[in-house]
Amino acid sequence: MGKIIGIDLGTTNSCVAVMEGNTTRVIENSEGARTTPSIIAYQEDGEILVGASAKRQAVTNPRNTLYAVKRLIGRKFTEKEVQKDIDLMPYKIAAADNGDAWVEVRGKRMAPPQVSAEVLRKMKKTAEDYLGEEVTEAVITVPAYFNDSQRQATKDAGRIAGLDVKRIINEPTAAALAFGLDKHGKGDRKIAVYDLGGGTFDISIIEIADVDGEMQFEVLSTNGDTFLGGEDFDQRIIDFIIAEFKKDQGVDLSKDVLALQRLKEAAEKAKIELSNSAQTDINLPYITADASGPKHLNIKLTRAKLESLVEELIERTIAPCRTAMKDAGVSVGQIDDVILVGGMSRMPKVQDKVKDFFGKEPRKDVNPDEAVAVGAAIQGQVLGGERKDVLLLDVTPLSLGIETLGGVMTKMITKNTTIPTKFSQTFSTADDNQPAVTIKVYQGERELASGNKSLGEFNLEGIPPSPRGTPQIEVTFDIDANGILHVGAKDKATGKENKITIKANSGLSEDEIQKMVRDAEANAAEDKKKVEVVQAKNQGDAMVHSVKKSLTEYGDKLDAGEKEKIEAAMKDVEEAIKGDDKDDIEAKTNTLMTASQKLGEKMYADMQAQQAAGAAAGPAGGEAPKSESKADDADVVDAEFKEVKK
């Protein structure tokens, strides 16, 4: 059985790790980096770039370069968060036929799971290159505050990438696993995991306990905001630069897509620099042009100014912290350790805010970029049966229920319930002789169903005619270990039942997923063909170079006919590598190889003759160095002489 890898599918960056025995290994990608930008670019020729290569070309290809797609996953186009992103993103966000938020690239609409699958495929390939074997199973992390639709969509992305997703686990929980197995001391401890990433914020209160030699990780509560992260911090800087430039130069950069992409890059860089220095220069020559000529942007940004720009964003993380503490029933004084996760947690102002709230210094010995992937790899080892000393008890982040008479949300499973879990409740009809009931499922904390997230609906039909309130309809909610919901309804009188796995009344259908899997496989096959063509071209080119060099040195030893034959074969290869026909390139390269055999024979004969001449001259030339070496007493000369003779 192959390894189960751990993948942190992040909004801004992604990371992959694997367990080797008792040690975790964060795997470097093909560029040698331990994290990969979650950026995907679609080229004109159909090539798909992922990671650093996609990020490098973003400025020149902004409309077809996708980033922060995780913020759209499992969301409806009409949601206010999506509408906010439409005005900010250089790429097009469109409504799918089912009402989901999709993206449009080069005239083609794509689902966020399909785009995220490209990043997952890169992570899969990274692991395969390191392990030297095929990888088919993974544990993928999601923000703890992701709802059912978002979890399901992440699982779909894994399938499209060719992965069997063994478990979806929450990012703070994964970070706690990494911390618990690496840094955790003796005895039971309560920890707070503050996870401020590129696009999402989570806070989880977790108890780590030693139960009969088994380390138990129990999530006491979780809270967060799935639309708050580093991307929002970048946007505050971009808005500031645009306002300053407009004030200074009278030009509005907000409508210039190319300029916006450069500003995005500069804002991210400035934000990172200001974590270590008090001031930075944002210098972008030729940012735009008007009738008077090119315009250059040069703005100084201080740490104090940045902090004032993002103060409200940092403050927004504190309310979920308060709620999580209250839900867990613990006071600040009972928290033993505060763990910081996510790239944004490196910002000094964020660290100060966390310290003020929890009344203690957060731990700095956990890598905020890698801890989540490491935790996922540990969970992979547990699921693979290689590790028996870890038990993970996670929770559902939001309450789940159904709509009942008057549009009320009747909660079946309350938030922060340990999963997996199952709960049943009996309901009845609202009207006389009602032949069917519609079960509408919602997720959220509001009292009225309409204020919560609709997850789906289904009907239970064939209820015998009877007065209202008489039929006994048992509704069962069952949440699996991935946090994904299954709902059933049963008429106790007739035994009729209907069950569904909640697929949001949007989401991808099975047919759509299968088509995307096939497209992904076709792309992989196409990529393989492209690589093979490149390799054939490289071999042909290397062969031409080698033969040319040999021909210059030994061509005069060949007769004219042989030389012409080789030159013609070289020309054929040079012509072939201008095209993309792999078989033709390989055939022409083989012809050149055969034609140049005579040249190889001449070279070999010439080298043998030289060696024979050198060996014959050896004894005569041996005396002088010996006498010199005695005079100079230099052993090195002897060694050199022996090397030549050999």
UniProtKB/Swiss-Prot annotation:
Function as written in the Swiss-Prot or TrEMBL entry: Acts as a chaperone.
Keyword Chaperone listed: yes
PROSITE patterns: HSP70_1 (PS00297), HSP70_2 (PS00329), HSP70_3 (PS01036)
Entry keyword tRNA-binding: no
Protein name as it appears in the record: Chaperone protein DnaK
PANTHER family recorded: HEAT SHOCK PROTEIN 70KDA
Region entry Disordered, spans: 608-646
Low complexity bias locations: 608-624
UniProt feature, compositional bias: Basic and acidic residues: 625-646
Keywords: ATP-binding, Chaperone, Nucleotide-binding, Phosphoprotein, Stress response
Molecular function terms, GO-annotated: ATP binding; ATP-dependent protein folding chaperone; unfolded protein binding
Induction of the gene: By stress conditions e.g. heat shock.
Modified residues (Phosphothreonine): 200
Assigned protein family: Belongs to the heat shock protein 70 family.
